[in-house]
Amino acid sequence: MPVQTAVVVLAAGAGTRMRSKTPKVLHTLGGRTMLAHSLHAAAEVDPAHLVTVVGHDKERVGAAVGALETELGRPITVAVQEEQNGTGHAVECGLSALPADFRGTVLVTAADVPLLDGHTLHALVDEHRSEPTPAAVTVLTFTAPEPTGYGRIVRLPHDGEIAEIVEEADATEEQAAITEVNAGVYAFDAEFLRTALGQLNANNAQGELYLTDVVKIARASGAPVFAAHLSDSAKVAGANDRVQLSRLAAELNRRTVENWMRAGVTVVDPSTTWIDVGVTLGRDVTIHPGVQLLGTTTVGEDAVIGPDTTLTDVSVGDGASVVRTHGSESTIGAGATVGPFSYLRPGTVLGASGKLGAFVETKNADIGAHSKVPHLTYVGDATIGEYSNIGASSVFVNYDGVAKSRTVVGSHVRTGSDTMFVAPVQVGDGAYTGAGTVLRFDVPPGALAVSGGKQRNIDGWVQRNRPGTPAAEAASAAGPHHSSDLHETEKQDLKDGIEQ
């Protein structure tokens, strides 16, 4: 029977150096919380049991774990460390959440090392089981030129094997000079770990139960202790404050961008491009400077994104072009063009080969294939059919002060500039509207809708009502000009109406 693996993720710390109301492990980078990064990596080991130890703000962190259960599609047990009494105590809490008869490998990792990946955890487990007699403990180590803050790996002089891990606060001057340090990631034999945890004591500078003391206990009992040395130290770098978090975010992004370039994506300026780990890109995508692709955004093959574009949870079809656009929770069809300066709000669906042009804002809008909204338009709560064109400066008036209503525009519709669609209203297939039309009623298919009366001019209105202004002086200098004659009553009616 294959040896089973259980993973215990430590997420109980307060993270006071973050100086935040948000628990440290719930701070984000690359579109995921540090906790999510750790649990994703743990899930790649395909453990029989996955446990997260929570403590500080346990309700909030526990809720985040619950959400990740759904995301990962596997159960995650939450163990509570009520009193923060060191890493040894935290692991004891996690171990108590495992079945009492569990006899496999216990992998222990931390929730604040977001670059640690499943490949590294697999390698640690393989090293732990590599000998005919499996190790009691296998420690992941790395070399740190500046080892401040890390536990030092003390090796035996005669064979170079690990003798103990000494925490910095307890290290002698000679031990403090050691540059091989503890990464805080371990593989344990479950039976040995249960026994060793019962032998821990708090006789140290911190007055806590150190998990690292388990190594010394193993050595004293003659149990095998292995080490797996990691050359890529960034994978186990922690984030204790926001400065460290920002550095890790930049490093994670650098790796993500480079991975996509190696996979066939052109990134013109990697230094100004940010791509979350949940993003998916097709081959031959081109990303111009100043682009942020966030959340679960997907971009199809041959699409061109940017410059200066932010897309969050947006699906972009093959061959589409998106320029200087801000979009979220939207769909852009294959071959469509968006921008510059477009704003796609949640619920926007742009069909294949459609167009949203300069200074167009959309929300809850379904715009059919080959339809165009070229410029200066708001489309909210609307359905537009195929091959339609919405004139410049049009507004879909979707809110009456109490509730929102929907506008439906058919296919092959042409609307003039400055058309107002006062919802709820429907425009039939093939209909036209004149410029400046206010649509308050449905338009039948093939009809031309025009609102407003005949233009009428009131001669001399500016000179009479705005005397002394530059406009009045300019009008007087232009000389007398008379519009078509109006009945005196009409003139007075117009004069009164405008002056009101």
Curated annotation (Swiss-Prot):
Binds 1 Mg(2+) ion per subunit. The keyword Disulfide bond does not apply. Acetyl-CoA binds at residues 392, 398-399, 417, 435. Catalyzes the last two sequential reactions in the de novo biosynthetic pathway for UDP-N-acetylglucosamine (UDP-GlcNAc). The C-terminal domain catalyzes the transfer of acetyl group from acetyl coenzyme A to glucosamine-1-phosphate (GlcN-1-P) to produce N-acetylglucosamine-1-phosphate (GlcNAc-1-P), which is converted into UDP-GlcNAc by the transfer of uridine 5-monophosphate (from uridine 5-triphosphate), a reaction catalyzed by the N-terminal domain. UDP-N-acetyl-alpha-D-glucosamine binds at residues 10-13, 24, 81, 86-87, 151, 167, 182, 240, 345, 363, 378, 389. The keyword Transport does not apply. Pathway: Nucleotide-sugar biosynthesis; UDP-N-acetyl-alpha-D-glucosamine biosynthesis; N-acetyl-alpha-D-glucosamine 1-phosphate from alpha-D-glucosamine 6-phosphate (route II): step 2/2; Nucleotide-sugar biosynthesis; UDP-N-acetyl-alpha-D-glucosamine biosynthesis; UDP-N-acetyl-alpha-D-glucosamine from N-acetyl-alpha-D-glucosamine 1-phosphate: step 1/1; Bacterial outer membrane biogenesis; LPS lipid A biosynthesis. SUPFAM superfamilies: Nucleotide-diphospho-sugar transferases (SSF53448), Trimeric LpxA-like enzymes (SSF51161). Disulfide bonds: none annotated. This is Bifunctional protein GlmU. Residues 459-500 are annotated as: Disordered. Residues 482-500 have a biased composition (Basic and acidic residues). GO terms for cellular component: cytoplasm; membrane. Signal peptide: none annotated. Its main location: cytoplasm. Residues 264-500 are annotated as: N-acetyltransferase. It is found in: Cytoplasm. Homotrimer. It comes from Rhodococcus opacus (strain B4). Mg(2+) binds at residues 112, 240. Its cofactor is Mg(2+).
